[in-house]
Amino acid sequence: TVKTLRYKTWDYFQQIQPRADVSDRVVVVNITESDLKKYGQWPWPRHILALLHANLTDSGAVLVNYNVLFAEADRMGGKEYLKSFPMTDEVREQLGAFLTDTDKVFAYAINESKNVVLMMSVKSDKDQIIPTTTPIIQKGVVLPWLYEYNGIVPPLTHLTVGALGIGVNVTSPEPDAVVRKMPVLIRV
């Protein structure tokens, strides 16, 4: 079809003459094989993320965008970690008194740096609607071109307190399974 030809032509032009880098000040930090060898499999305990975040901030990072959803408590550290061991609630509580809540450590690092944008996720399941808090467009305004979702999955509240903002990463692949565009706004 004409649409497929247009997509393939666009892809070809992107390969032979890609856009020039806008700035060398933007750095994408990825998890590599050597990181996995050093820290173990993903997900990492949040106290490790707090240390890595502090290193980014100390290195001069002005903005850190986590493209990972932190919607649940860290089960790899602190009191949550104790739940994976068979013991009585009394023993678990006594041991828990000596452990630091790793989510609080990560929240502290986020709050101290004042340079974080966290991620939320969207839901299409009508049975699990989570209300939004701050609309940026008034109710009743019809924008038929917006992608529409029934709710969001926000990050943990105590992580968002010190964050600059919360973003959403929504992709909509074309029929050939290639993502060529992303929406700037969505309707929830």
Where are these regions (language model features)?
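Non-transmembrane functional regions of envelope-associated proteins
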Residues: T1-V188
